[in-house]
Amino acid sequence: GGNRDYSSFVVSYLKEQGVEELAYVIASHYDADHLNGVVGALHAFSCGQVLAPDYVTDTRVYESFERVIKEQDIALAYPAVGDTYTLGDASFTVVCPEVYDPKEDNDNSVGIRLVYGNTSFLICGDAGKAEEQAMLDSGVTLDSDVYLASHHGSEGSSSEAFMRAVSPTAVVVSAGAGNSYGHPTRTVLNRVKACGAALYRTDLQGTITVTSDGTSLSWSVDATQDYRDGDEVAAGAADTTGTSGTAGAGVTDAAAGSTDTTGTSGTADTADSAAQASVAADTAGSAAQASGGETAA
């Protein structure tokens, strides 16, 4: 959930959605651009359980994460592949990592596949090719309607084989407008186009929300036809591929699980969509990604 400055943005966004308590908060991993908003959400809302990867790191934001969990006596779980959690009429299953490696960071990302009725969502944090291959080898179900592109559309994620297994109808890329990492990369954008999925980009379109009623999906914005990579967007290159979106702030690793009587809402990165649940999971997550504040590659 964004850099420190964006923690209040994540909290404000969730409050605007009517969130009062969180059944689950998922910290995909401990990079600052995924964890700061999580810490803010834990301070602001009552939380039933936190799901996080089983490793430690020597950073101030991780220390803050540990502190708020202890101070508020929040249940903390290190989920395993196959663990399933219920959210009203929806549920989500952990799809990665197969093994927690203390030497890894991005490939320790906790990934979930969320299902509500006939709709499904795949969110895997900053998982790279090694973790993607482990998912493919394990045989977990990956096929999903909506795929939140791992690692902000980095070339080291969303391999061709993985994209074939997911077979998404829509791909959301959460990346900061004008970020210095070139996210999303040309390679990943080409893979999205090749699989025929609709493309949504927070660097061009700001906050993106997808809502499921268990049968169909509703989007807050139209899909973009702009396939410029992150470097081209940062350089101000003209869009020759289609229609550009509108740059703005977005919310994308923080929280899952407040009452939503209208259906399932999902916000691209947190974070992190569920029946009777508002999901901000790596989907309330990185406000920094969506407003040009990426700090981790």
Protein language model annotation of sequence segments:
Residues G1-A297:
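Non-globular, low-confidence helical/coil segments that flank catalytic cores
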